[in-house]
A protein has these predicted regions:
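Cytoplasmic-entry segments and transmembrane alpha-helices of multi-pass inner-membrane transporters
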Residues: 81-118, 174-175, 188, 197-198
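Interhelical loop and adjacent transmembrane-helix boundary motif
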Residues: 2, 35, 47-55, 215, ...
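Short membrane-interfacial helix/loop motifs at transmembrane-helix boundaries
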Residues: 20-54, 119, 223, 271
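Membrane-interfacial helix termini and adjacent extracytoplasmic/periplasmic loops
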Residues: 36, 45, 112-151, 185, ...
């Protein structure tokens, strides 16, 4: 036991330095008056009150709207793909899952730039439409371009946990359902879907949290017109230089994420 304790000590030191200390600093900045040094702590809730202004609440609403839309699309497309993959032979499943994860090996920034080339007014898609005699369509800097970028970047995080649940499912339950006279639809809704819910909830949690907290995709595909909560935090730290307000927003986002994760965990237990 002592040997294992010694092995874990370097990790604890690393976690304290790169996780605990930054969180403490963010908390101190969040509750400190703007312009004051952290070491001369002056308690205030003004940074949190500021976030309740209509301008910033609209950012939360926009972030949740696009996050929910992205999650729904990823679930609608990802579940059938995961189901189809789970029905393939085991070797084919490994290959298909590899193909699903390969895009994640490429830096998100590069993938987003690739979508900019595809969706721009002079991009590949509009060029193909022109060859078909169709007028160019404005796709960049719209909800469409942002959602497309979010869906394509985060789809694997929906497919993989669902596939894991489906592939580990005890097939005897499905056979028992058929033996009891259930048709394919009843078997899916009463057996397959319910047994795959843990994977679905994990996928929903990952895609939603990534969607509302990212800032690269909305910034590039939205042309700076789409201020989501991730972009707001980035702008406060990098552009505005208001670390106090940026830290307060970061804490609010962390609390929202914890609440969402708790709800997902409760739903998983209920199922």
């Amino acid at each position: 036991m002592k040997q294992y304790r010694n092995l874990i000590k370097p990790y604890l030191v690393w976690a304290f330095v790169v996780i605990v200390i930054p969180l403490i600093l963010i908390a101190l900045y969040a509750f400190t008056e703007d312009g004051n040094e952290v070491l001369t702590f002056s308690f205030t809730l003004d940074n949190f009150r500021k976030f309740l202004e209509a301008t910033y609440m609209s950012v939360i609403f926009k972030s949740f709207k696009l996050g929910i839309l992205t999650t729904v699309i990823c679930l609608g497309l990802g579940y059938p793909l995961a189901y189809i993959i789970s029905k393939c032979p085991e070797k084919s499943q490994s290959l298909l899952i590899l193909l699903v994860t390969i895009p994640e090996w490429i830096n998100m920034l590069l993938r987003t730039y690739a979508w900019m080339n595809l969706l721009s007014d002079n991009g590949i898609i509009n060029h193909l439409l022109g060859l078909l005699g169709i007028s160019p369509v404005t796709m960049m800097y719209t909800d469409f371009s942002v959602v497309v970028g979010l869906v394509c970047n985060f789809m694997p995080f929906m497919i993989i946990p669902i596939h894991t649940s489906l592939s580990k499912m005890d097939k005897s339950f499905i056979e028992a359902a058929y033996d009891l006279g259930a048709n394919k639809f009843q078997t899916f809704t009463k057996v397959i879907w319910k047994l795959s819910i843990p994977g679905v909830l994990n996928g929903i949690m990952m895609v939603f949290l990534l969607s509302i907290s990212t800032f690269v995709i909305p910034k590039l595909l939205g042309g700076g017109q789409y201020m989501l909560i991730g972009n707001l935090i980035e702008s406060q730290f990098i552009s505005v230089g208001d670390w106090n307000f940026g830290s307060a927003i970061s804490l609010i986002l962390a609390v929202l994420i914890l609440i969402f994760m708790s709800l997902m965990k409760k739903m998983d237990k209920d199922e």
